[in-house]
């Protein structure tokens, strides 16, 4: 049994802009989560081509420890709290698979994302079987809704309801910003349709952990996309060549930060 949910994140950026913004924000967010032996380690970041699909392949290890709930830390042996993330970014479609060497086929998080130039109105963009799709819970994430943010995650400088882009004039986002987008001819919009599959087979813990993982994914998607929009002026002028150079530098910085910096970033909400 697996737990399937689709998260829809609407943003006041274009699909093309998001490609750069996402990669910039992933690099920056990785630095915010790395230190004290924990965080992100980039093993591979290279172009790929397979079965007519072309894009960028990445393989990362997330060293978690304090970022998992206490009940898992108590049960899991040392080294079992590292997860491997393999991602195939054939933008505007991306596929990410997260596994754990200790749990092998009993643990899986799969995130499949379509980026579409709409306001989250398409049904079943991932073309699931009708019988499967009718059991998928759809969750809308509103990046400007503070009630969707945990108080310990809130930062005023990462609040789309307060941010005003100097370079683009976008923001701040009011309570009805999504409805207003339709009438704003000079402001692009898009939706990230993120289909998340979670499998965790551990007798007595399955439901608890699968629900915890979905809760954390929702938290990550919310915080990440709030940051992405509020960092708009930092990335909107960058090219993909700029991003690749930045990723190289970030890889070096992450290796250094993991060894020298204190633990930081999101911890498990026990």
From Swiss-Prot:
Coiled coil: none annotated. Residues 250-263 have a biased composition (Basic and acidic residues). GO terms for molecular function: phosphatidylcholine binding; phosphatidylcholine transfer activity; phosphatidylinositol binding; phosphatidylinositol transfer activity. One of its GO terms (biological process) is axonogenesis. Keywords: Acetylation, Cytoplasm, Lipid transport, Lipid-binding, Nucleus, Transport. One of its GO terms (cellular component) is cytoplasm. The modification N6-acetyllysine is found at residue 215. It catalyses: a 1,2-diacyl-sn-glycero-3-phosphocholine(in) = a 1,2-diacyl-sn-glycero-3-phosphocholine(out); a 1,2-diacyl-sn-glycero-3-phospho-(1D-myo-inositol)(in) = a 1,2-diacyl-sn-glycero-3-phospho-(1D-myo-inositol)(out). Residues 250-270 are annotated as: Disordered. It comes from the Eukaryota. A 1,2-diacyl-sn-glycero-3-phospho-(1D-myo-inositol) binds at residues 58, 60, 85, 89, 96, 194. It is found in: Cytoplasm; Nucleus. Phosphorylated by PKC in a calcium and phosphatidylserine-dependent manner. Catalyzes the transfer of phosphatidylinositol (PI) and phosphatidylcholine (PC) between membranes. Shows a preference for PI and PC containing shorter saturated or monosaturated acyl chains at the sn-1 and sn-2 positions. Preference order for PC is C16:1 > C16:0 > C18:1 > C18:0 > C20:4 and for PI is C16:1 > C16:0 > C18:1 > C18:0 > C20:4 > C20:3. Belongs to the PtdIns transfer protein family. PI transfer class I subfamily. This is Phosphatidylinositol transfer protein alpha isoform. It comes from Oryctolagus cuniculus (Rabbit).
């Amino acid at each position: 049994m697996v737990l399937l949910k689709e998260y829809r994140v609407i943003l006041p950026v274009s699909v093309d802009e998001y490609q750069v913004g996402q990669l910039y924000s992933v690099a920056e967010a990785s630095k915010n989560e790395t230190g004290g032996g924990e965080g992100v380690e980039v093993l591979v970041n290279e172009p790929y081509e397979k079965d007519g699909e072309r894009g960028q392949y990445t393989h990362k290890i997330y060293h978690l420890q304090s970022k998992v709930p206490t009940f898992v830390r108590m049960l899991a042996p040392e080294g079992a709290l590292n997860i491997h993330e393999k991602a195939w970014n054939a933008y505007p479609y991306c596929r990410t698979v997260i596994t754990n060497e200790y749990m092998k086929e009993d643990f899986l998080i799969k995130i499949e994302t379509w980026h579409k130039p709409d306001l989250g109105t398409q049904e079943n963009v991932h073309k699931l079987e009708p019988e499967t799709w009718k059991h998928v819970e759809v969750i809308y994430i509103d990046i400007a809704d503070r009630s969707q943010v945990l108080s310990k995650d809130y930062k005023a400088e990462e609040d789309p309801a307060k941010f005003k882009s100097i370079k683009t004039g976008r923001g701040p986002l009011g309570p009805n910003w999504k409805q207003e987008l339709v009438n704003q001819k000079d402001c692009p919009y898009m939706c990230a349709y993120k289909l998340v599959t979670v499998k965790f087979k551990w007798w007595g813990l399955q439901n608890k952990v699968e629900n915890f993982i979905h809760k954390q994914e929702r938290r990550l998607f919310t915080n990440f996309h709030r940051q992405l929009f509020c960092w708009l002026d930092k990335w909107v002028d960058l090219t993909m060549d700029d991003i690749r150079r930045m990723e190289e530098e970030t890889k070096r910085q992450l290796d250094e930060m993991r060894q020298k910096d204190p633990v930081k970033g999101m911890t498990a909400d026990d």
